[in-house]
């Protein structure tokens, strides 16, 4: 359950982090996550898109949890995340938003609300170990300049044309991405520690994405989907046709169409999803070792 990271935006089923982890665990997936989902602690409205590839706030992650119809006691693992869509991607990618405002929203949603949903997960699934998957740096100071500008334009739907110094604008954009990544990581860790103290047991584990600044979009060792700079309107991923069909059903406008078709850009590619799966497998193995030693 969660947003596009747990869903595996742009990836074929067999390449998704959740799929790789499930194969390792020898279990089946009940996929609740979808692109664009927010935690939505205070939301009651809901709607369903024709494809999980189409970014949409709803069903929220809380609604995903509430809509689970299986036997809660049979669930052994829950892979989850959330928060960036409550903060809003446009805010993270807006250098004109003050750092303190970005930090406030990040603390509220990746801290307070992530803790709230994690507490509900551990209460609903009494036998499950929750794996809280961290975010990654979407951009870094190792990202190519044209790549930074391209991703900004995609997120906001406008040409990169700052009125002030372009270099300063790019730098602040990157700093926003790095700040969100680092702060959300710390908040996720704190939420996991809080739940484990509260329950008196190892009910949750924080799983770092395993990605560093060199793995950001347009960086030398990028593990994220990227548009080619000479063909910025061509989607690079495995699920673009699914989104194309879904877009026609939704009937959105031309601007929304382009954003939907390119919505995998900035998400973990095949290698990136595999890296996160490795991190999850390692975390599960460590948890099993600790349990056996008790």
Spell out what each predicted region is.
Residues 7-105:
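Conserved SGNH/GDSL esterase-like catalytic core that processes O-acyl groups on lipids
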Residues 275, 279-291:
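C-terminal alpha-helix
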Residues 4:
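Catalytic nucleophile serine of serine hydrolases
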Residues 59-267, 274:
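Alpha-helical cap/lid subdomain in secreted, periplasmic
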Residues 266, 272-273, 290, 294:
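Cysteine endopeptidase catalytic domains of the caspase/legumain-like
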């Amino acid at each position: 359950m969660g947003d596009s990271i747990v869903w595996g935006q742009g990836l074929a089923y067999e390449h998704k982090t959740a799929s790789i982890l499930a194969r390792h665990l020898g279990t089946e997936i009940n996929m609740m996550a979808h692109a664009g989902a927010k935690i939505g602690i205070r939301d009651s409205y809901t709607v369903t898109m024709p494809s999980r590839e189409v970014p949409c706030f709803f069903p929220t992650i809380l609604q995903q949890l509430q809509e689970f119809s299986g036997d809660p006691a049979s669930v052994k693992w829950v892979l989850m995340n959330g928060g960036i869509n409550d903060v809003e991607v446009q805010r993270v990618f807006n250098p004109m938003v003050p750092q303190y405002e970005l930090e406030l929203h990040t603390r509220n949603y990746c801290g307070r609300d992530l803790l709230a949903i994690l507490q509900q997960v551990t209460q609903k699934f009494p036998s499950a170990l929750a794996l809280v998957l961290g975010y990654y740096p979407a951009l870094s100071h190792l990202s190519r300049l044209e790549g930074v500008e391209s991703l900004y334009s995609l997120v906001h739907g406008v040409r990169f044309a700052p009125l002030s110094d372009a270099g300063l604008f790019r730098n602040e954009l990157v700093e926003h991405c790095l700040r969100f990544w680092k702060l959300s990581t710390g908040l996720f860790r704190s939420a996991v520690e809080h739940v484990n103290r509260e329950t008196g047991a190892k009910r949750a584990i924080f799983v770092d994405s395993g990605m560093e600044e060199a793995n950001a979009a347009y960086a030398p060792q990028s593990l994220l989907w990227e548009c080619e700079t000479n063909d910025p309107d061509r989607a690079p991923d495995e699920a673009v046709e699914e989104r194309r069909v879904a877009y026609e059903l939704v009937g959105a406008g031309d601007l929304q169409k382009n954003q939907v078709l390119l919505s995998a850009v900035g998400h973990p590619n095949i290698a990136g999803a595999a890296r996160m799966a490795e991190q999850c497998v390692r975390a599960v193995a460590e948890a099993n070792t600790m349990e056996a030693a008790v």
